[in-house]
């Protein structure tokens, strides 16, 4: 309820939302059982979220909040007055899983509280006037134990046959902060550019041990952190980059690119030490 309340303070008239929240809090005092409290929660959420009537649930919905190389797809089908079937696919890098649930319809929303293989994961889908769906789960407990490592079912879902998210770039991921550096990197690595994007499932800054004032970003794919990884190092004038992934025979292959030439003997210490974490030579 708190998450919905805070979100609606932004999207709706804050004064009205606050009044509805206070009225809901008072209604809880009239409850004498857990079932009554649960019903009051969903009634309050529906009112505060301004849930539209006659929402069209059936179809394929994509989680547009998911990170790069991660995602979620929910297929709602067999819609009835009080129930609907949800087929769910969630992934984060190479970690993935699929679930099926017969969800309940209540107060214009959809609630999953009987996920196959887990009775502790609850997910509430709230329809929005925009036509999107907002999903909230008990991720801190039940759903976190059920979902693939690093994956989340929470987020904003949009109905579409295909993934509606814009194609990611190293600039849109903010690995590069401006278009000029992104274009220079594209020119440097050529067709390998997309492979760097596809490796940027998780990415973090790391130290420039060469002390040349460079920005250094290392990245990897969840579920394959030791076999699908890359690093990019750049200054105002130069770029160095390397990537490791299995070749056609499953052996780890190393690729190196630099605006100063692709001689690995002249590779900066930052990249050389990074390489040693994964390859012995």
Where are these regions (language model features)?
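Tryptophan-anchored aromatic micro-motifs
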Residues: 53-74, 116, 152-181
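Edge beta-strand at a domain terminus
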Residues: 99-105, 139-169, 263
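A short, surface-exposed interaction/processing loop segment used at functional sites
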Residues: 142-153, 234-279
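Contiguous, well-ordered beta-strand patches that form the walls/edges
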Residues: 18, 26-29, 90-133, 231-232
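Amphipathic, heptad-repeat alpha-helical segments
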Residues: 1-18
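Exposed beta-strand-loop-beta-strand "reactive/processing" segments of non-cytosolic proteins
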Residues: 206-234
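Short, surface-exposed coil-to-beta transition loops
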Residues: 35, 68-73, 95-100, 117-124, ...
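N-terminal glycine/threonine-rich, aromatic-flanked beta-hairpin/loop signature
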Residues: 67-107, 183-209, 216-217
């Amino acid at each position: 309820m708190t998450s919905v309340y805070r979100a609606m303070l932004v999207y709706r008239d804050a004064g009205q939302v606050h009044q509805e929240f206070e009225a809901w809090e008072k209604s809880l005092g009239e409850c004498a059982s857990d079932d009554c409290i649960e019903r009051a929660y969903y009634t309050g959420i529906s009112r505060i979220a301004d849930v539209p009537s006659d929402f069209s649930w059936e179809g394929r919905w994509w989680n547009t909040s998911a990170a790069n190389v991660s995602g979620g797809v929910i297929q709602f089908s067999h819609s009835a007055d009080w129930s609907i079937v949800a087929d769910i696919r969630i992934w984060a890098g190479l970690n993935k899983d699929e679930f099926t649930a017969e969800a309940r319809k209540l107060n214009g929303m959809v609630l999953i509280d009987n996920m196959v293989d887990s009775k502790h994961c609850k997910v509430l889908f709230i329809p929005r006037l925009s036509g999107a769906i907002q999903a909230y789960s008990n991720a801190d407990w039940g759903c976190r134990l059920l979902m693939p490592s690093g994956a989340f079912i929470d987020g904003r879902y949009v109905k579409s046959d295909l993934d509606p998210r814009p194609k990611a770039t190293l600039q849109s991921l903010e690995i590069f902060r401006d278009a000029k550096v992104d274009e220079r990197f594209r020119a440097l690595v050529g067709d390998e550019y997309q492979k760097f994007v596809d490796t940027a499932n998780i990415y973090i800054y790391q130290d420039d041990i060469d002390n040349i004032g460079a920005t250094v970003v290392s990245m990897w794919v969840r579920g394959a952190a030791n076999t699908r990884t890359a690093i990019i190092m750049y200054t105002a004038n130069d770029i160095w980059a390397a990537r490791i992934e299995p070749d056609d025979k499953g052996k780890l292959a190393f690729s190196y690119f630099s605006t100063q030439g692709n001689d690995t003997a002249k590779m900066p210490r930052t990249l050389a030490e990074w390489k040693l974490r994964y390859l012995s030579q």
